[in-house]
Amino acid sequence: MRLRDCHNFSDFRRMAQRRLPGPIFDYIDGAADDEVTYRRNTESFETCDLVPNVLRGVSEIDMSVTVMGQKLAMPFYCSPTALQRLFHHQGERAVAKAAAKYGTMFGVSSLGTVSLEEARGISVSPQVYQFYFHRDRGLNRAMMQRAKQVGVEVMMLTVDSITGGNRERDKRTGFAIPFKLNLAGMAQFALKPAWAINYFTHEGFKLPQLDEHVDMGGGTMSISRYFTEMLDPSMTWDDVAEMVRQWSGPFCLKGIMSVEDAKRAVEIGCSGIVLSNHGGRQLDGSRAAFDQLAEIVDAVGDRIDVIMDGGVQRGTHVLKALSLGAKAVGIGRYYLFPLAAAGQPGVERALEQMRVEIERGMKLMGCSSIGQLSRENLRFR
């Protein structure tokens, strides 16, 4: 299968599956428990129909948006995701370059495999730093200060991951960082020598945001232990309010799903919230972000930028979310599978396909700008 044969999310996923060892593919593709929420994230869009208008003069399309003060050429962005170096040696570098080419925002994770400084040097596009709240308050302050010095535009605190989700696919293969595979997992690596050549003939795996603070090497600290031992489950709204004051710039909470929490985010001065269930990877059975979007937009949409992610695989999914009131949409697996399949060319092809789908969809709906999308364009079954 070649990159030019990939025309949609499923094609990229299939190509990535052919290239990646099973444990790494399952790390991207898998979710928590029975993966009900994971499936529901995409299925939720199917209960909503688009109602187009015609004869509206749509020869010129403007799909730009402004979210949390950042001007994006397209209404979707590359959400911060962890461990990208495992999927392809270009990792976040490929994503940053692709985001710059298409004029959209991208994010670097606390578990990212390139440094904030390097990512900032690659792309002038708006950059998000996805941050986890640690037990060590000094560590939190130091990491925020580092992001500020680099010129990160948006601080994004993930609030739905105070402990790791129950990802049973990883348990079956023994997937962990550092690698501690069982026999079945090791056999899968042996079947994919091309991945091994790519991985071992390029620079080694590292986590630059944590290198100075946490020893992740030598088997001393696994990713799962990082979540259970380093992150602070006692985090409260008072802690977050203090972070918002310290950052004194656009601050976003990722993982908000209730109206009550959305209102609290407004009260403490957040610029945005991301409705997210972490791609179904944390609390299985939780509500899909798209299903919860209208309720939260109605409650706080005039006071804070409401964003959503989860299950987005088509341009029409983005248009439905925007019509409900989202200011932008985050994508994760949508670009990770192309990254794993083909590096930067794969990510660029995926972003271009999404751009074209949104442009085509807007023309067919009779909308020449994002601001013309509204709930009048939607009907729920």
Task: Show which residues each predicted segment covers.
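Alpha/beta catalytic cores of nucleotide-metabolism and tRNA/nucleoside-modifying enzymes
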Residues: 1-46, 291-309, 313-381
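An N-cap/entry alpha-helix motif that binds or orients negatively charged groups
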Residues: 1-69, 178-235, 371-373, 379
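Short beta->alpha linker loops
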Residues: 32-33, 110-114, 135, 257, ...
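Short, conserved beta-strand segments within well-ordered enzyme catalytic domains
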Residues: 49, 64-66, 75-79, 105-109, ...
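Glycine-rich active-site/cofactor-binding loop and its immediate structural neighborhood
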Residues: 72-111, 116
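Short, basic, glycine/proline-bearing loop/turn elements
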Residues: 77-83, 126-132, 224-226
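Alpha/beta enzyme core
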Residues: 83, 97, 118, 122, ...
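A gly/proline- and charged-residue-enriched helix-loop-helix capping module
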Residues: 101-122, 126-140
